[in-house]
Structures are given as structure tokens and as C-alpha cells.
């Protein structure tokens, strides 16, 4: 009996050993299949489709391609597929293109809008400029208080909408006026600053603000906004009343504020002071109605300051960037850097935010500072045709793909249903290029980031162009009417637009050319560019019967005729 038991145990162990060996062999082979050699410079990324490129305005190029990538860069995982789309520039340092941020304008509160609506709003507030392409921006408050405010520091056009920042892995991309960037934790002034503007809109003076929505200081300047929770005794102070055009209060730890507006009357302070957004007004019949007043107060005992805040003077109250951040004009927050000096971070991460395959929006920069805006679709579903075959990526996969796009540094913007990439179309509107995971519909987000350029003020007349010429005419918009001294350069030859049209000649058939434009606006030299193409030459003939025979005509005549002889054979 004992021998039988021993034999059984040996047999059982042998079977187990065979099973383990077979399992290990099959697993090793499975991994070798999954992790086979890729067709890109990354061992974690494959391309499925050919790269589709579209030339946009200003030298910006749109790229679209379907790819697969190894989930989380983990060899125990599988390659998953997704659509990838991004925009960049061939030469950023010499380009007339700028990188900017924006939020849909609202006087009183934070607001959300789709990336397309935000682009239109940016153009509305920047006449003479156009958006070429862009994506959604920072994460924003869309649950809980649902304020729609960005969750990190945010500046647009030099206006510090939200001075609060988080820090650490939740950093900020700051964009300087010369298109260079600074990244990390922003450096801010210790005090808010009161900007006082002259009649031409230039900053005449900047003064430190000692406090806001708090008890006034006898030797300083105190700001009060509509969000002030308490009333304050301002007897002995002069209260300079203002009407704001924008007022924002952050819900961050510092509750920072931003105010922009115009000063009104100045008066002695009272015992219980507080500005309001709306007030109740009593009618002659005794009824009341609500009127919008949009008040802010500046309280001070300094008469020199009061004299500078005369009625009609425009002002701004905000924190400033300082140090290496002092030239930043636009900023946007991110959560996690993914690519650092050419090295992809977070491989095989155990942080679910990092390793989960989501739709993602990224901003990255090449060695020369050229920006790349990318969206990768995700949240694949067999029941949702928009998302089918789109799984999304971890941050490591995104870093590998951004590296393939030429980036050396990259950062993760808001993703999921927010991920949206838009591009300007030929009709002056915007197309959504990617496949948003909310069943193809754009989500409204807190802010956006765009590549923008000067409006060229001219356009191509395709019907008047030929196989060797491009017809360019001045636009009929109000902006175009305000510009002078237009010069157009095509293929190295410059044409002065003395009338409303010039024709670039001596060009090659069916060829794309850069159209470089210079003009003056109020004495300032402005530059812009776009691409235009010559037509395909049609060497055919048309034969039209008449009562006396046939009329034979060339379908297309040109200064450089390809067809010089026509032979007709009639059987």
C-alpha cells in the first residue's frame, strides 16, 4: 500500500510538472506574439493605417493615423488600437503662429463651452486674428460645486483669471509672449496688483493691493468684490466705485480673485459697505425690480490713488507672475508630465489615473520648442459605433506616441469625454477631427488651447487660378478693409496689391505653394501665411456641332500650354 501511495504521488507530481512546463511555454509564446517587433521606432507602438496629413493655415499640419500600443507598457498586457490625431508646425521659431489659451467670456461667473464655441469666442474677442487648430485644456470643476472653473492656474492674454495653483505633479505650462514656455510651479507676486490704464489702453501705473474682501488697511489699497461675504466699516476711507466687465473668484485654497472694469464715482465710505452684482430698485408704484450693477470697490485713504481712479479710467486687479514666469501671457494646468527630456515616464504604473486606458489630450514640445497638440480617442465599446475599436491609452503609451510625433517633453491635459481636437476648415468654420467619447458629441469644458495667427486679409480665388497661376484677392471683411500696403509673396516673387487682386505667375501645375502676406494695420507691420494650389491642367478638347460643321476648342488655355497641337481623327 505504501509503494502504491509513493507511486501515485510521483505520478501526480510529474503531471503537475508537465502542466506547469506547458503553461509556462504557452505563456512565453503568448508574450512573444504580443510583444513582437513593432513597425515604429517605439517597441510599444504600431501603426495600422498610413499617415494622413492635411496642410492647415500658417504652416500648421494636421496628422491622423490609427495605431496600437501596449497597455501601460506592460509586457503582460496586450496591444490595443485607437485613433490618434495631432497638429504641429514645420518651423515654430520663424512662424507667425502663436500658442494661446482661452475661456468663453462671461462677466459674472466661470463658464464652460465646447472647444469650437471657445474658438469662435476667441476670434470674436481678437478681431484680425484667426484660430487654426486647438484642443480642450485643463481639468475643470464639473461635479460637486460644479463651478466650471479650471482646477489649476489659468491666464489668458495676460489676465490672471485664476492665480491659485496646486503644485507638484499638477503643474502649469506658461506660454511667454515670444512663444517660449516655462513649466512647473508658477511664481506669483506676494500682493495683488492694481493696474491703471491710460486712454490708449497702455498700463500707466501698477500699485500693490494690501488686501481683498477683508478689513481695510489705513495705509494701503483694499479691493472688494461681489463675492464679499461680510459688510465692512469704511468710514474715514474714500470708496472708489467701479463696474466690472469680468469678475472671477477661485474656489482654490487661497480664494484668489480677478477683476477687470471701469471706475465710476468716488465718495466717502460708510459703516456697512459691500458691493453687489445685482440690487433691488424700488419703482414709483412701490414695486421692486432686480437690476444688474456689477459693482466692485477700491477703498483707500491715499488721495493720490483716488485722483488716479477718476471716472472712466479702466483698471485691472490681479496677481502677477514673477521671476522666470514674468513674461508669461497664457497658462494652462496639467496633471502629470508624461515625457521628460525624451524619456517616457510611468511605465507599468500602479496609479489607476496613469495606467487606465482613457481618451487623452496632450500638449508636448519638440527640441526647438515647437508645440504639439494631440488627442487619442478611447473608451471603446461594442455598442457605441463612435467608440468601437478605440480603447484609449495610459500616460506611458501617450508618451511613446508623443515621442514618435517629435516631442521631448509632454504633459497630460483633461481627457475622457473632454478630449477634443478641432481644425479650421476651408469655409472658415471648425471641424471636430477626433471622435469624442460622449457618443461623438463635444463636451463643454473650462478652457482651451489654440494655435492662432493673423488673418491674412486675402484669399485665393480658385475659379480664377490656373495650372500655372494663383489668383489672390483682398477679402471684403471690415478687418481687410482696414489694412493697407498689402504684399504677397509666392514662390520667391513678391507682388504688391495695388488693386484688390494679384495673380502669381510662372508656377508648376497642381502644386501647393506658401502664400506669405505682409500688410500694415494702423502703421504696424503684420505678417501671415497660408497655402494655395495651382490647378491640374486639362489637355482635352471640346467638339461642339454647329449648322456649318464643328467648333473645336481647348478646355483650358494657359501661358504655359502643355498641349500645343491637337490631332483629330474622324472615322
Regions found by a protein language model. Name each.
Residues 142-167, 171, 175, 331, ...:
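Conserved, well-ordered active-site substructure
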Residues 7-29:
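Sec-dependent N-terminal signal peptides of Gram-positive bacterial secreted proteins and lipoproteins
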Residues 504-508:
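Short, flexible loop/turn segments at beta-strand junctions in immunoglobulin-like
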Residues 477-488, 559-567:
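Solvent-exposed loop/turn segments flanking beta-strands in beta-repeat/beta-sandwich domains
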Residues 457-478, 530-550:
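Pro/Thr/Ser/Gly-rich low-complexity, intrinsically disordered linker/stalk tracts
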